[in-house]
């Protein structure tokens, strides 16, 4: 089952560019710089291919707020209710900067597969500091690039910060919760089954 994790250039190219600029054209976890940008002043800075990716990798058919998956997301992840209500419909949240984060390749692949996650360090997380968690089948070749203290701070590099807000702590918290559940299932459960009523009632 294919996840639509990276915004396509057809309908998400503008938001992809805006979010990468918001994140300073660096991977927010590794601080690796975008190889497509002009050479950084700091010549010691590593470069790689970056992508602005969805925090919650929606399937195209699940982008309707009436879908069973979204009914269960609202029910079993209460904090998501306000996030969905604020954007009125799932599609409004899908192409929203709050649902997009900049990561390097191949880290964004692990993020999309829920093999790495960012947990808020406080209830309101106004400081946007997150604890990095790795999960089952994480690509261990990436370990040298991860922050030694296990913390990731998100910073908005835009002058007009309201135009492109930072990723939502609620969405990152939900992503982390799903990653933990998938980790506990030994990788034997896919996201569709995870978000089914029958499965969630057993958790």
Language model features: what each stretch is:
Residues 26-60:
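Conserved, ordered domain cores of eukaryotic regulatory proteins
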Residues 17-18, 40-41, 91-92:
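Beta-strand elements of modular eukaryotic interaction domains
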Residues 45, 49, 56-203:
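A detector for short metal-coordination/catalytic motifs
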Residues 1-36:
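A structural/positional concept
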Residues 1-5, 38-40, 75-79:
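Short, charged, low-hydrophobicity "junction" segments
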């Amino acid at each position: 089952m294919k996840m639509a994790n990276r915004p396509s250039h057809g309908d998400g190219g503008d938001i992809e560019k805006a979010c990468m600029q918001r994140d300073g054209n660096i991977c927010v976890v590794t601080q690796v710089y975008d190889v497509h940008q002009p050479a950084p002043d700091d010549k010691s800075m590593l470069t790689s291919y970056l992508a602005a990716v969805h925090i919650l990798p929606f399937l195209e058919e699940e982008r309707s707020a009436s879908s069973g998956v979204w009914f269960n997301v609202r029910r079993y992840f209460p904090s998501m209710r306000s996030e969905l209500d604020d954007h009125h419909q799932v599609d409004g949240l899908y192409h929203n900067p709050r649902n997009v984060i900049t990561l390097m390749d191949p880290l964004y692949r692990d993020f999309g597969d829920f093999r790495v996650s960012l947990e808020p360090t406080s209830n309101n997380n106004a400081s946007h500091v997150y604890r990095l968690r790795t999960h089952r089948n994480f690509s261990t070749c990436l370990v040298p690039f991860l922050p030694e203290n296990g913390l990731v701070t998100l910073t908005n590099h835009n002058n007009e910060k309201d135009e492109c807000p930072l990723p939502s702590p609620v969405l990152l918290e939900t992503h982390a919760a799903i990653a933990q559940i998938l980790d506990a299932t030994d990788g034997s459960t896919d996201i569709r089954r995870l978000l089914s009523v029958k499965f969630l009632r057993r958790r």
